[in-house]
Amino acid sequence: MIKLINILKEMVTPDEINQVDNFADQVLSPVDVDLSSKHVLDRLTGRESDVTFEQLIGFFTRLGQHKKEFIDFFERYNEIVATDRKSKLNIPFINLTNKAIAKTIMRKLNFLSDTPKLTFE
C-alpha cells in the first residue's frame, strides 16, 4: 500500500516551483525570493518529497502575513530560517543584497539551527 501511495503522490514540477517563486516575490516584495538552488529543486522534485505545490503557496501566503518581521530579520542577519508551524516546513534563507536565496526545504517539527529563526503560523 505504501508503494502505491508513493507512486500516486504528485511531485512538484519545475514550472510549479517557478510559480511559487513568482508568488513569493509578490508577497515579500521588495525582497526577491530565489528557490532555484539545486538542493531546493532536488528536495522538491525528488521521489521522496512530501511537499506539495499547495503547501508551498500556503507557506509563502502565511510568511507574507509576517512580511515586516521577515524583512526586519533579513536586514539584521545574513541567514535566517523561516518556519511554518502549520505545515511544519522550514526554509533556511541566505541574504544576498535583498535577495532571499533558499538553501533547502524540509518538513521537520523541531528543526534545530543556530541560525535566527522566524516562526509563524
What is the predicted function of each stretch?
Residues 2-121:
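Ribonuclease/tRNase effector modules and their secretory precursors
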